[in-house]
């Protein structure tokens, strides 16, 4: 609180942070998206797969915070119901390099059940063309003034909703190329690291 009161400006990189600060510091709070350097990222638009490859990363110490403790059992229910139409790739407490390698082959990533917006991890996945099932509320699109792209499969923190969204993907695999292409476009449009860096510089110089 003391830092927020005495600083010249506040930059919120997520909608969640923005709505927390803006009521109290409306004159010095701004929103600037997270930066993604995709210069070394291989972007690949997914084709319609024979089997949907669902990817879930689990950090044992943070499973309840990220919601993977709820999503993972539901994902296994889907795989049990549709064994010939989907498979699961898990990264449990995996080193970052291995985690990224496993993500590269995924069609859909499950991440951040309780979030309104995509995390850094989700944005990295999207930059690769991986579809994210996680936080993607309308507030996320409104704050960046995105009118058309809707690449994120938004999910609510309920087992029923998670099941329905996962089942929708399995039964509508033809949408995977479209959502994958939108994911790449979304990151390049709103999270270009050079563009974001310039926004930081502009805000700094103005304050």
Feature locations, PLM:
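A charged, aromatic-enriched C-terminal amphipathic alpha-helix characteristic of glycosyltransferases
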Residues: 174-205
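Conserved donor-binding/catalytic core segment of Leloir-type glycosyltransferases
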Residues: 32, 36, 40-66, 72
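Acidic donor-binding loop of glycosyltransferase active sites
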Residues: 104-117, 130
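A conserved nucleotide-sugar
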Residues: 54, 72-100
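Short hydrophobic beta-strand element within catalytic cores of glycosyltransferases
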Residues: 131-138
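A short, active-site helix/loop in glycosyltransferases that binds the activated sugar's phosphate group
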Residues: 1-29, 38, 73
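Short alpha-helical segment that forms part of, or immediately flanks, the ligand-binding pocket
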Residues: 100, 122-127, 141-142
């Amino acid at each position: 609180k003391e830092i927020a009161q005495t600083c010249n400006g506040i930059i919120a990189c997520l909608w969640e942070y923005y709505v927390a600060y803006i009521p109290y510091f409306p004159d010095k709070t701004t929103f600037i998206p997270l930066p993604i350097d995709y210069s070394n990222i291989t972007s690949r638009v997914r084709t319609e797969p024979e089997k949907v490859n669902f990817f879930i990363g689990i950090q044992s110490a943070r499973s309840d915070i990220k919601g993977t403790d709820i999503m993972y059992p539901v994902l296994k229910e889907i795989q049990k119901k549709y064994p010939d139409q989907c498979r699961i790739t898990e990264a449990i407490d995996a080193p970052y390099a291995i985690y990224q390698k496993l993500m590269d082959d995924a069609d859909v990533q499950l991440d951040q059940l309780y979030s309104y917006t995509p995390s850094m991890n989700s944005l990295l996945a999207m930059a690769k063309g991986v579809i994210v099932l996680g936080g993607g509320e309308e507030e996320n699109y409104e704050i960046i003034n995105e009118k058309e792209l809707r690449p994120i499969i938004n999910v609510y923190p309920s087992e029923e909703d998670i099941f329905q969204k996962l089942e929708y993907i399995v039964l509508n695999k033809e949408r995977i190329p479209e959502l994958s292409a939108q994911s790449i476009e979304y990151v390049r449009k709103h999270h270009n690291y050079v563009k974001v860096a310039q926004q930081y510089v502009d805000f700094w110089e103005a304050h």
